[in-house]
Amino acid sequence: MKYNSPYEIGLGDVVILTDDTGYKTDHLVLINYIKGETDAKGYTPKTNRTILIDNYGKRTTVHDYSQMEVVA
């Protein structure tokens, strides 16, 4: 199932990303920035973006939440 809104994304969610070759990998949601919402430190992002982390500690930034699939 794909996300319909950035508001549905929760910290710690396990998501599946598919790369250009069709290979799917699991990631954890580390940070979810929503356009126009200010966080606790006063940062307000200009675009939606989600920062993911994989099993090896590599971080990946996703700008289009519809690319991620929810692991149920």
Please name every model-derived segment.
Residues 1-14:
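Mixed-charge, Lys/Arg-rich low-complexity intrinsically disordered regions
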Residues 2, 27-31, 60-66:
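Short amphipathic beta-strand/extended segments with alternating polar/hydrophobic composition
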Residues 46-72:
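Intrinsically disordered, low-complexity, charged/polar segments
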Residues 37-41, 69-72:
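Short, surface-exposed linear segments at secondary-structure transitions and domain or protein termini
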Residues 8, 20-22:
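Short polar/acidic secondary-structure junctions
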Residues 22-39:
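Short beta-strand-centered aromatic/proline hotspots
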